[in-house]
Structures are given as C-alpha cells and as structure tokens.
Amino acid sequence: MCKLGDIIVVKEYFGSDGKKVNQHSFVVINDEKDMIEGLSYDFVANVMLSFHDKKHKTKKLKYKSNLPIKEEKITGKDLNDKGGYIRADELYYFNKEKIEYKVIAYMDHELLDELIQLILILHEFRDTGPVAKELRDEIWN
C-alpha cells in the first residue's frame, strides 16, 4: 500500500510516448480514489529521473518544471547515489490493482511541499494569456 510522499518503483507502465517502460521510480503525490473520463485511479505520482552526468544535470535543471532531488530529504533502502530530479509537469494516474509496485523510500515533508507548490504554480500558469505564455515558454523551452 503506498501513501502520500512514498517513493515507489513501478514494475512496468506506459510512458507519455505510449511505449512500455520497465522498473521506474515515482513519488506519490495523491493517494485518493477518483475517476478521469470513466477510468478509475487510486493514486497520482510524478516520475523521478537520474542525472547521467554534470552536463545532463545542468541541462535538466534549466527547466523550471524539474525539481532537483535533495538526497538528504529521502529516507529508504535500495536508493541509487546518482542524484536526480522530479518532473513536476507530468502526472501519472495509477490503479493499484492493475500495476505491480513496491515502496522503497519516502520523501520528507519539506521536499514534498516544495513539489506540490511547484505543481500548483505550473497548473495556475498553464492557462492562456500573455503572462502564462511567457512562463510556459520559460519553463518548456
């Protein structure tokens, strides 16, 4: 059973490009049941990614939608030591009965709050208008 703030590894899922992805980490940001267009889910998560090297880290952290992972804010076992980031602009909706996953760690409340705030800011500025367009351009370009 996963809950808010847990870091999980999902055995397999379909990525935003529609391709199957194996063994990937996520942080749970909502653990309440709901439906989207007739499809049920019972938790929402953001994908976590590792940095390949310093150049990759610099490139990925230029995007304001990527939140760096502060390793001292994560507690658990089976963690890699690469360092990484969370994609705050991608939400994945899962049904626990339809996927295999395991909880490997949890995120402290401070980092989780920072992630939730970033998601809310991104959501607020996703609408149309010149300010939203400027922010979107800054975030995604």
Language model features by range: what are they?
Residues K62-N141:
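C-terminal terminal-subdomain/extension
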Residues F14:
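Short, basic/aromatic recognition patches
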Residues D17-K73:
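Compact nucleic-acid interaction/catalytic patches
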